[in-house]
């Protein structure tokens, strides 16, 4: 790959790798809680603490493919830097959700709601990128250049 291509995706790759490390951390928490309660074997049922860790991890895993899809779509189709920043914010919010879920369930609600908003923002960035592509394709007008012109004046 040439440097320009790598430069266009490096921030997205960094956020993706950080999310992989975070998933490993969550899985380690589940494994640790399972072994604490059940000895050496992994079982899906157990104490309330294990149920909370397992459910929090499962909820994070359920939203993960959607996060990756909108992160990369927004970064490739619209702009890499805001998409990567939103991705980092999502990872911080997901961490807050996970830790909050282990305590009182009401502590996880702000993280959950803000995480949904970040995914919506990334989705809207993706739609804007697709819209801009078709504006250029059909009308020869680049909306992104117009936005840059307006914001710099």
UniProtKB/Swiss-Prot annotation:
A GO term from the CC aspect: endoplasmic reticulum
One example of a Gene Ontology biological process annotation: leukotriene biosynthetic process
GO molecular function: arachidonate binding; enzyme activator activity; glutathione peroxidase activity; glutathione transferase activity; leukotriene-C4 synthase activity
Chain segments annotated as transmembrane: 9-30, 53-77, 81-102, 116-128
Keyword Endoplasmic reticulum: yes
Location in or out of the cell: Nucleus membrane; Endoplasmic reticulum membrane
Protein name per Swiss-Prot or TrEMBL: Arachidonate 5-lipoxygenase-activating protein
Organism (species): Macaca mulatta (Rhesus macaque)
